[in-house]
């Protein structure tokens, strides 16, 4: 209830004079007042001395909103200096949305010189009156400075208001024990909230939790469900994982054709491991007609992306003349290159 009042920012209730009688009654009950003669300013409930004061205050917030809208319009059009002027005017009338947007301008040097301290100050001003985006930005800046306990405090504030990215970040904090004690169950709960809002990374995170049995009982079918959601949003990681799960029959019936379909999607998105696995399918004839030429082409693409396993297979192709003319010099070259990269990655 209090949060709802806070988000309104400034409203006036005077014995039902207010535009929304239901909300006015809620405020009356919340405060335990009988007469209900008060107005709200910047999230603080103040007893109204007279009706005129309340009306003047209401006009200020209305004007502040207009100034903010002008600022935002100029910002979108790229007129950053004008935007800042309007934001400052709005801020003087208590518009905290303007403060958050000013923070963005200071952080990125739009219309003003970059100043992360002023940016933080502006974000914090909005965060303290419940602005979820500002809370996220405050948390992000704390995180950048490795102040994880402070970061988790503000991620949680934003997450509880439904801020999607903050929910995922909070899940990460619990999963990896950043600023809080590790708790996989709590991590999964936050991942799921973000995932249900469509956060692609959170969908992968919760899929991995089900895959590994971290915070939940291991459930490959549930993992597949979440990987599919992320894959359909273009995640090459999820597409690769689906290719693997269909290839191995994890949570689904083994299906090499379906495996290839997902590997190909991931490969088209540049996923090096997917390119290598797709090459293996052509090399072994799993789900496709065996084709050494196509396999070798894909192995070279994977090798160019640093997959040393692909280099070993290229060496094998030159050793036995598969998809290429037999050439022991080339075979040795690729084998040595693979060894060097493998040792470097250890």
Predicted region positions:
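Sec/Tat signal peptide C-region and signal peptidase I cleavage site
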Residues: 19-24
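Hydrophobic face of amphipathic alpha-helices that form TPR/SEL1-like repeat modules
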Residues: 66-76, 100-108, 136-145, 169-176, ...
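A short, charged, amphipathic alpha-helix used as a generic interaction element across diverse proteins
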Residues: 48-61
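TPR/TPR-like (Sel1-like) alpha-helical repeat modules
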Residues: 126, 312, 316-319, 325-343
